[in-house]
Each structure stands twice: as C-alpha cells, then as structure tokens.
C-alpha cells in the first residue's frame, strides 16, 4: 500500500517539477514585461492573436501570456499570482484538475488559462455553482480581462435570449453549470438558427469541480412540457373510432398489422371533427390520435397483447408471455389503449429534452477544474472525464492541528460535548465553525447554544448573497457559525487580526459518507499558513457508524463502564470510519458509472437527432433529404407486403392501398403492373411516380414557400417523434430492472431495446414526413411552431418562450372552394383529391 501511495505521490511530484521549469520561464520574462506601459501591455493581446494566426499554438504562448496576466493582475487587482498559482494555471490549461487548498486563490489562478485560451476567439466558459459566485467573479476578474482587451459576458437565468447571445459571444463567459446545460438543450429545440445562443463548446474551467462533476453527476437536467389537450383528444378519438365500420371506413391488413382509414373514413372524420382536410398540418395531432385509436381497437387485443391490472394497462411480452411491468407503448398507443379500456389516461409531464452534467461537460473540446478536494475521486475524473488530478503545493506550510476523532456512546452525549466545546472556545474569543450533515442537526445545536446564551449565525445554501456576509463575519473574534457541509463553498473565511494567534476552530458533528466532504470542512481552517484546529465528534448512533458495524464497539464501551460524557479517542476507530467511507464512495462511484452507461445509450441517439436537426436548420433546400426518406419508406412498405416466399401470398393490394392512402393518388400505381415485378424492382416505378408528384406540387407554389413548407413538416414531425421517444426510453429505463430474470443483463437489454426503438422512430419519422409532404395542403400563414412549450425542471430554469417568425405565404385554394381548373367541382373532389 505504501509503495502504491509513494508511486502516486512521485507521479504528482514529477508533474510539479516539470511545471516548476515553466514557472521559472515566466519569472524570467518579468523584467521585460514590467517596464511596459498599460497600453503596451494591452497591445500584447493583439500581438498574441496575430502570432496564433501565423501558426504558433497556445502552448507556445503560455510563458509570455502568463507573465502578461501576472503583471496586469498586479496593476488592476493589486494581487500578484504566486508561483504555485502559476502551476495551478498550467495544470488547468493542460485540461487537468488543480487541487488547491482553501484560501490559495483559485479564482485568481483561473484568470491565467482563461486569458490564454480566450485568445483563440472560440470562447471560454468559467463555470460556478451559483449565480452569486458567477456575478462576483465576472465583476472582479472581468476588470483584469477587460484591461487586457478581452470581452467578458455573464450568463444568468433571468436574461433574455438577446442578452444570452451577447454573453456567449464574449471571449469569456461566466455562468452556472445549470444554465449552460439548459441553454444547450434549448438551443436544440429552436426553430431558427438565429435563436441559438451558444457557440460550439470549446474550453471550460469548472470551479468546485468535484461538486458539479461528482456530487451532481447523477442529477439530469430536464426540459419538460405538458401535452395538455392530449387526454381529451384520446377520448374524442376513441369515441370516433368506435363508430367506424370495418372494410368500409377503415382497412386492416392482418399480416402486416397495418390499419388505416379509407376515403369514406377520412370524410367521416372530417365531418365528425368539423374540419376541411384531415391531412392539413393544423390537424397533425388529431390524425395521430385517430390512427392510434384505430390501432388500439383493431390491432391490440386485451389479454393477448396487454392485460388490465389494478387500473393500469400492462404489456404482455409476445415471446415469453410475461408481464412487462413499467414498460409503456410509445407514440401515444398506450394512452389510446387506456381510453379504449376506460382506465385513467396517464398524462404525466413529457420530457422534451434531457442531459446529465457528465454528458454535457464531456462535449467540450477541453475541460478542466479547480477544487480543494479531488484526490479521493481521482479514478473517476480520469476514467470518465479524462482529467488527471494535480495536487498543487500550498504557498505557505499548513500548520493546522487536525485532531483525532472523539467517539461517544450516544448522540445526546456527543451533542452535549460539542456545545460545551463551542462555549469554551467562544469565551476565549476564538471563532468557531460548526459543520453539520443535515439541517435538523444545525437547528438542534442552534437551540442548545441559544439556551446557553451564545450568539451565533446559521448558514444554509438558500440565500447566496447573505451567505457571503455570514462567511465574512465567521472569522471575527468570538463568532460562532453553524453550517451544513456544502454551504459557503467558494467564499473564504478570513481571520480578524485579533484572533490570528488562535486561528479558526472547525468542529464536525459527524463524519460524512464521503471523505472529500470532511476534507472540505477541515480545509476551512488554516488557510494560507494561518493557525487553526479541527475536531470531529462522533457517536455510535451516527448513520455511518450504524451502517458499518459499531455494535462491537458499543458493547466494548458498555463493558468498560463508559458513560455518555466519556469519549474514546482511538486510531482503530478512525481507521474503521475511513474504511467505511471508502466503501460508500466505491458504491457511489459504481452508481455514477452505471448511470453513465445507461445515459450513453440516449446520448448517442441525442447526438444523431440534434446533428440532423442542426443540418435541417442550416440547409437551404431539404428536397434531396426528403426524397431519401420517401425512398426508404417505399422500400420498407414493399418489403413488408412481399415478405412471404410464395408469390401468391404477397399482399400487392395492401401495398397499393397503403401507397394510395399515404403517398400517391389513386391510379398512380396499378396492382397488375406491380405483380409483374420482383420485389427488388417494385420500388423504382413507385419512387419515380412520387418524384413526379413532388414536381407537380412544386409547380403550385413559389420555391421559397415550398422550402419553408418542407422545414415546417420536418421540424414538426422530428420534434414530436423525438419527445415521444425520450418518454418511451424513460419508461423502458424504469421497467428494465423488473425484467432482470434469468441471466439477462438489464444494461444490455436496455441497449438492444433502445436501439430497436430508435430505429423504429427513424422509420416512423421518414414515413410521416413523406406522408405530409405528399398529402398536406399548404397553409396560407405557414410558420414553424414548437411542438410543446418546454419548461426547465430545475430552480434555475427560465421557461422563456421561443419567438416565432411568421413566414407569410401567398394565396392557396381551400378544399371546399371551386377548383381553378374550371371543372365546376369542389377542389377536394377534383385536383385536390386525397386518397
């Protein structure tokens, strides 16, 4: 074990030695940088940018750029970065984590790599845990960057889209992790590229990196929306479908399980819902609900495909006959069956977009972070984010006194001892910080201190601005501050001059399940070589002690006749606690790793959809893409209707009916013509006819209008199907563990089923786009619309509505208007006939 530790330590030492050489280079440049005037110093920024365009790299510029920032910081902020801060900056620039102890100046350290990487013009994001810290750092460090001629932006939750665009366009952007993630998701839901706010993700420096990438790694960011009319529509569609007659108003192909409305059925629907054209883009949702209602009634059979159990629809696995609890049919079929069976239609909020911090931050070209405590999670940072943890030496030696844990028999005895210790230190005038794991504990100690007449502050993470004031007072003479462990991170406790001899006393009321959090609490004392003392009070009734076998120790204390006021101070107990913490940390790491494996399935799918969506937004002409979709749709339809080996069993009539209903007009493709062809030859004449019809449609309107119509269709279909797919993947994920029977690996099942569902969604997108392009009439006031209004599910969401740009279109013939060909018939019964 000692050998391994030594090896790890040696690796860190080698890195420090290597960086020390660069620090010496930076120091050597000081004599040439110091004499420069402010204007000449500013001019260095332009010089560096020019050198980058001529082929130099940011690595080449590092020593000189760091020397420039150091001199500028001295002039503007009155702070001169130490050598150890230069090392921290080098580690950050190289895409690693700088572990720098509390009070060592992480914020100032970050300015060095931020400036250097901002010279590329690609943007640098400085990420903090809350908006107060983002604003503070942007205001303070922004002065330095602006002095050197760089632009600084701050991205807040309350900002408008225009303000966010300005913030992201700056060379350096300060933001919270939540806001960055939500902006990324919102950018992939917009309908016009002018509405996007983010640029490509280049370089991020995360402050308190362990808090964001480890503690919050399992929290997904979700933008959700309510499909409010959905429940009602399913009921209306269900009532309508019950009135339909087989063969006459809908046709059903037993072999392909394909069901669709006939011309009579379409007319009946238009009358029933008082609309002119069921295939109009305005009625996408209605048509979808009718189709799913048809499938629910005609294709899906109770006690064969599903069962009704305790008021819920439960799917039956067609291969094993097992109930697939937790799984729901996608694309609204499940709700249609719920309407059919008269059970409650579940209209839970729909996830429109989701991402975890793990996957968001892994998209950056380069990522780095700073914290006082990262070494214990080094394996996770290396394996998941490809970042090494480099422990930066402190500027002055740490002289803090970390005392061994005191263990009491009961919680009551422990808290009495804690309060007694606080009272004694308070009398001497020593400032005390009390760390608690839970808010209830802090309230209990607060009551006990009030009874003893000790004035104190309670610190929790609810009010960030007030938090900074409390922290500022926490180092004053006789101050007592009770804080939950995470509160106050990012703000230093500075000692008053009259308490420098004592230093700060940090009292922990129990061990956290993570050593890292305990180390953060300890690190509050003894900053920058100040004196200080830390002491943890434990009891046998603490959660960690209860979980990891403290019964023997409790029995031992009973045997020794120890009462509640007598603690034991034992290295053996401290080691047992540490080993328990390591086990919990290991379990938590495994859980985060597993989350990432599951999330990677959706990540790959999300990247495909978002990339294609981006291409659609930027494309001037989608015709080629849509023709490809039509080709795929036709080929799938041909394959589905000709899958039997014997030619007589092919369902050519079903194929022609499908084509007439969804893509072509009656008579475009004849049954007898197709019967003369082999399956691989059938697609060609069908596709040729489709292209001919597409050309006819293009002649009916100006090109600009046709191109916008294509985009409207693609966006509406893709966004609807994708949100339904995310929902289906959510249900699959929830139910997959319930099917871990036999030797089945749930992750592998999730990957396989998720992939099959994604392929099915892509096919469904292609088919629906083809149908709407060929069958829908063009609206007069055509505009792109969001499928559902999204709302960020997080305190820092901004549910800002996307501004839509109307695209005004020319005159179009209504379905019930007289046809312009002069036949005297209504347009829908003449040139606008819909099969």
UniProtKB/Swiss-Prot annotation:
Gene3D superfamilies: Helical scaffold and wing domains of SecA, P-loop containing nucleotide triphosphate hydrolases, SecA, preprotein cross-linking domain. One of its GO terms (biological process) is protein targeting. InterPro entries: Helicase_ATP-bd, Helicase_C-like, P-loop_NTPase, SEC_C_motif, SecA, SecA_CS, SecA_DEAD, SecA_motor_DEAD. Keywords: ATP-binding, Cell membrane, Cytoplasm, Membrane, Metal-binding, Nucleotide-binding, Protein transport, Translocase, Translocation, Transport, Zinc. Pfam families: P-loop_SecA (PF21090), SEC-C (PF02810), SecA_DEAD (PF07517), SecA_PP_bind (PF01043), SecA_SW (PF07516). May bind 1 zinc ion per subunit. It catalyses: ATP + H2O + cellular proteinSide 1 = ADP + phosphate + cellular proteinSide 2. Its EC number is 7.4.2.8. Zn(2+) binds at residues 819, 821, 830-831. It is a peripheral membrane protein. It is an enzyme of class 7 (translocase). Its cofactor is Zn(2+). It is found in: Cell membrane; Cytoplasm. The keyword Membrane applies. Its main location: membrane. PROSITE patterns: SECA, SECA_MOTOR_DEAD. Residues 788-807 are annotated as: Disordered. Belongs to the SecA family. HAMAP family: SecA. Monomer and homodimer. Part of the essential Sec protein translocation apparatus which comprises SecA, SecYEG and auxiliary proteins SecDF. Other proteins may also be involved. Part of the Sec protein translocase complex. Interacts with the SecYEG preprotein conducting channel. Has a central role in coupling the hydrolysis of ATP to the transfer of proteins into and across the cell membrane, serving as an ATP-driven molecular motor driving the stepwise translocation of polypeptide chains across the membrane. This is Protein translocase subunit SecA. The gene is secA.
